[in-house]
């Protein structure tokens, strides 16, 4: 799930308000949900990037991608 710019702006707005005057219970809950969505999005993007990496030994030119990563790539149709 991608997070929108509006959601990031709202996270920042709530953070500023929390510092300045505090948040209501509803705002604290909203902030927690938005932060969780943001972290989930970052983790998913990071995982997606890592799962497409192919590691090559500089000296030999051999594929030295870890077996666990190769298996994930096969499962996702990115390897033979």
UniProtKB/Swiss-Prot annotation:
Keywords: Cytoplasm. Pfam families: DUF896. Coiled coil: none annotated. GO terms for cellular component: cytoplasm. It is found in: Cytoplasm. The keyword Ubl conjugation does not apply. Belongs to the UPF0291 family. PANTHER family: UPF0291 PROTEIN CBO2609/CLC_2481, UPF0291 PROTEIN YNZC. This is UPF0291 protein YlaC.
């Amino acid at each position: 799930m991608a997070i929108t710019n509006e959601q990031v702006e709202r996270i920042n707005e709530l953070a500023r308000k929390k510092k300045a005057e505090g948040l209501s219970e509803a705002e604290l809950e909203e902030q927690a949900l938005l932060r969780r969505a943001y972290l989930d999005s970052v983790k998913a993007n990071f995982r997606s990037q890592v799962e497409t990496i192919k590691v090559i030994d500089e000296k030999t030119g051999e594929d030295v991608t870890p077996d666990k990563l190769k298996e994930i790539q096969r499962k996702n149709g990115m390897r033979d």
